[in-house]
Every structure is written in C-alpha cells, then in structure tokens.
C-alpha cells in the first residue's frame, strides 16, 4: 500500500485542554515533532499547527488542527487540497474510548465510531473513509452519558503514564507507518500493552 504523507493529531486548542484524554492525537504529533526536530508553526491557511519533516526518506506533513475537535475536517481538507494528498495518504492519530490506556491500534479506513473529529474529517473528505487511523487508547468511563466529560478531563496519573507509553511505543514504528507497512506494524504494536 502507499504510505502516508499527512499525519494529523487531533485535539482541542487552548491550555485548558492540554494533556486531556481527547488530546492524545495532538500529543503524538508533538512528540514526533520533537523526535524529528521539526518546528510546528501556526499556519492560518491550514487552520492549525503545521510542519514539514522527512521520515524514512519521504517528505511528510505534520498537522494539529487548532479548530475545535468537531471541526477538524476543515484543517485536513485545506492541507489535502493544497498539497493534492488523497485520503488514503492521510493518517489521523486520535484518542480511542474502546481500547484501554497503554494500547494503540492502527488501521486503514473505517467509520467514525462516534468520534466527532473523525466524523467531520469524513464529511470534509467527501465521505471518503479510507484514511488511516492510529487509535491511542484512553479507556471508557463505563456509561455513554459520561463520555463527553471524561474525554475533556486529564487522565489519572497511572492512566496518563500508560497513554504516554503507548504514544512512545507507536512512535518506534513511524518509519514503517509512513512507508505504509501497516501489517508489519500491526503485528508488533497490537500486542503491546503498557
């Protein structure tokens, strides 16, 4: 399969949302930028923090939308149109309620699973669902009525450490992820649990 040219980390802007569960995707991009010595800068035309980096010899774009989560598609659409990137070459990194903290799962395509950021991205990419997803586990609060409050809060210290460990572990495979070697990554990453 073709690799990924645009890596998008979802989150909400502002210091009040920093290190909340919902910002796990943005944390992943920030960690990759540090690891790659890439400076993310505010880019108005892309509605987010943006940077260019070489990974596995390929030029890739890093994006953290600075819209709110439910408007993330606007930023993804802007970068895709400007650089002519098809949805299949986009990887969205996001928090995932359905897997526990300390785990991360990679897949190509799929639905939105109730995630408002994914829902908006699908809508802005003309209902194309074929972009990749790296799902960072944050766990579930137990009842659907608690989800909105849960994702906007900081994780307990033990869970936060596990989320960071899953981010670090998944970053070990970034070269293979960018190259599109998803099966190789899945075989390793899906067995990891912090």
Curated annotation (Swiss-Prot):
EC number per UniProt: 3.1.1.29
Enzyme category, top tier: hydrolase
Residues carrying the site annotation Discriminates between blocked and unblocked aminoacyl-tRNA: 12
Residues at the site labelled Stabilizes the basic form of H active site to accept a proton: 95
Family matches, as InterPro entries: Pept_tRNA_hydro, Pept_tRNA_hydro_CS, Pept_tRNA_hydro_sf
Top-level division of the source organism's lineage: Bacteria
CDD domains on file: PTH (cd00462)
Subcellular location: Cytoplasm
A Pfam family that the UniProt record links to this protein: Pept_tRNA_hydro
GO cellular component, one term: cytoplasm
Gene Ontology terms, MF aspect: peptidyl-tRNA hydrolase activity; tRNA binding
Any GO BP: rescue of stalled ribosome
Key words, A-Z: Cytoplasm, Hydrolase, RNA-binding, tRNA-binding
Keyword Coiled coil attached: no
Positions that bind tRNA: 17, 68, 70, 116
Keyword Lipid biosynthesis: no
Active site residues of this protein: 22
Catalytic activity: an N-acyl-L-alpha-aminoacyl-tRNA + H2O = an N-acyl-L-amino acid + a tRNA + H(+)
Family under the similarity heading: Belongs to the PTH family.
Quaternary context: Monomer.
Biological role: Hydrolyzes ribosome-free peptidyl-tRNAs (with 1 or more amino acids incorporated), which drop off the ribosome during protein synthesis, or as a result of ribosome stalling. Catalyzes the release of premature peptidyl moieties from peptidyl-tRNA molecules trapped in stalled 50S ribosomal subunits, and thus maintains levels of free tRNAs and 50S ribosomes.
Annotated protein name in UniProt: Peptidyl-tRNA hydrolase
Source organism of the structure: Marinomonas sp. (strain MWYL1)
